[in-house]
């Protein structure tokens, strides 16, 4: 099996639809009839969900980590868009070192320090600013109902035990659809792949084996 990491920095996407068309088109060309698995964390997990429900024919399995399926009410969307556009503005205009310190203190990270490797020099403030705008949860479709009716590829939803918000999302999704399995990783918050690597890799490996050997 070969693996390929998607670099969102390589292109400038206009919206979810543009990203989906480009990404799924490339996957379709490259994989032909070979089994394809898709994995994404946080924002990448939201993009993975979008590709999963809109092009279910492409995937043998999907793994999402700490990903939101979408907002329901207009009020939620308005509030989220206001927040994301403010972050977008700040990443365009403020010092990225100080901004990232503030970002790491957000409640979603469960009070845990960032243990992932991060090279500040490799980060592009303009691109990050753009992502906050075009990939805002406010601009994402509400995928919950589509995921509940998902009947093709199995989906593994992973959350950390300390990440109560996303654990509840995973539980609700798994309860609503037999194709969705939810696994809670111990000793981890939102940044599961870095906070408990061994347990994360173990769950992902079991899922991949089950998909490829069914």
Please describe what each predicted stretch is.
Residues 85-91, 102-113, 131-138:
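Helix-loop "lid/cap" segments that line or gate small-molecule binding pockets
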Residues 175-191:
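Catalytic histidine neighborhood in serine/cysteine hydrolases
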Residues 2-39, 202:
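Active-site loop/oxyanion-hole signature of alpha/beta-hydrolase fold enzymes
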Residues 53, 59-92:
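Flexible "cap/lid" loop of the alpha/beta hydrolase fold
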Residues 40-44, 48:
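Gly/Ala-rich beta-loop-alpha elbow adjacent to hydrolase catalytic centers
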Residues 203-211:
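C-terminal alpha-helix
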Residues 188-201:
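Catalytic histidine-centered segment of alpha/beta-hydrolase-like enzymes
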Residues 125-172:
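Conserved serine/cysteine hydrolase catalytic core
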């Amino acid at each position: 099996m070969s693996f390929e990491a998607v670099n969102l920095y390589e292109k400038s996407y206009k919206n979810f639809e543009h990203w989906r068309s480009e990404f799924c088109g490339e996957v379709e060309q490259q994989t032909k009839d070979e089994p394809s698995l898709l994995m994404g964390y946080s924002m990448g997990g939201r993009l993975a969900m979008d590709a999963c429900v809109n092009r279910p024919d492409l995937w043998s399995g999907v793994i999402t980590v700490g990903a939101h399926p979408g907002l329901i009410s207009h009020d939620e969307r308005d509030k989220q868009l206001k927040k994301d556009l403010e972050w977008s503005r700040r990443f365009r205009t403020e010092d990225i070192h100080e901004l990232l310190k503030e970002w790491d203190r957000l409640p979603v990270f469960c009070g845990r320090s960032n243990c992932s490797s991060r090279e500040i020099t490799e980060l592009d403030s303009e691109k990050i600013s753009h992502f906050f705008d075009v990939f805002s949860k406010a601009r994402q479709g509400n995928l919950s109902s589509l995921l509940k009716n998902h009947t093709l590829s199995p989906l593994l939803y992973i959350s950390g035990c300390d990440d109560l918000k996303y654990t509840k999302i995973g539980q609700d999704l798994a309860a609503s659809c037999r194709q969705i399995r939810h696994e809670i990783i111990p000793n981890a918050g939102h940044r599961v792949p870095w906070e408990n690597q061994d347990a994360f890799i173990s769950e992902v490996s079991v899922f991949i084996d089950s998909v490829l050997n069914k």
